[in-house]
């Protein structure tokens, strides 16, 4: 059996509210997270909501990293989905912690695309 990708979901509670509403800061965090996990960045797009909140995605050659923030709740939801064996999604976590400074982080690990290569190639 082969795993085509790895997907971690991050539930980040008790984050710094100012960081959660900082669009340039969120964009920089995404770029730093891409570098930290060894992925190849294609592009980054962020959007600032009114009155608050930021959504962003880093499109990777290996998949994506996304974030959605709720500053009023001190909460952020993130996805780090990678394909290939050289990218380690968990390596993004220190960069994310450093910027958002969450009190609590829950990591949900999902193995994506479990296939029997020999069966597929037959």
Curated annotation (Swiss-Prot):
Cofactor: how and how many bound: Binds 1 pyruvoyl group covalently per subunit.
Classification via Pfam families: AdoMet_dc
Catalytic activity: S-adenosyl-L-methionine + H(+) = S-adenosyl 3-(methylsulfanyl)propylamine + CO2
Gene Ontology BP terms: spermidine biosynthetic process
UniProt keyword list: Autocatalytic cleavage, Decarboxylase, Lyase, Polyamine biosynthesis, Pyruvate, S-adenosyl-L-methionine, Schiff base, Spermidine biosynthesis, Zymogen
Pathway the protein takes part in: Amine and polyamine biosynthesis; S-adenosylmethioninamine biosynthesis; S-adenosylmethioninamine from S-adenosyl-L-methionine: step 1/1
Keyword S-adenosyl-L-methionine: yes
InterPro entries associated with the record: AdoMetDC_C, AdoMetDC_fam_prok, AdoMetDC_N, S-AdoMet_deCO2ase_core, S-AdoMet_deCOase_pro-enz
Positions carrying Pyruvic acid (Ser): 63
Site annotation Cleavage (non-hydrolytic): residues: 62-63
SUPFAM superfamilies found in the cross-reference section: S-adenosylmethionine decarboxylase
Cofactor(s) needed: pyruvate
EC number in record: 4.1.1.50
Catalytic site positions: 63 (schiff-base intermediate with substrate), 68 (proton acceptor), 83 (proton donor)
Broad class of enzyme this protein falls into: lyase
Job of this protein: Catalyzes the decarboxylation of S-adenosylmethionine to S-adenosylmethioninamine (dcAdoMet), the propylamine donor required for the synthesis of the polyamines spermine and spermidine from the diamine putrescine.
Subunit: Heterotetramer of two alpha and two beta chains arranged as a dimer of alpha/beta heterodimers.
Similarity remark: Belongs to the prokaryotic AdoMetDC family. Type 1 subfamily.
Protein name per the record: S-adenosylmethionine decarboxylase proenzyme
Organism of derivation: Methanococcus vannielii (strain ATCC 35089 / DSM 1224 / JCM 13029 / OCM 148 / SB)
Gene it is expressed from: speH
């Amino acid at each position: 059996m082969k795993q085509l990708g790895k997907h971690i979901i991050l539930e980040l509670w008790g984050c710094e509210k100012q960081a959660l509403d900082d669009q340039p800061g969120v964009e920089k965090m995404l770029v730093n997270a891409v570098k930290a996990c060894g992925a190849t960045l294609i592009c980054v797009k962020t959007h600032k909501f009114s009155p608050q909140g930021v959504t962003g995605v880093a499109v990777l050659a290996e998949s994506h990293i996304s974030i959605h923030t709720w500053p009023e709740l001190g909460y952020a939801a993130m996805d780090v989905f990678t394909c290939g064996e050289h990218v380690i999604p968990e390596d993004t976590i220190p960069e994310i912690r450093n910027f958002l400074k969450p009190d609590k982080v829950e990591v949900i690990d999902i193995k994506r695309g479990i296939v029997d290569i020999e069966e597929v190639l037959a």
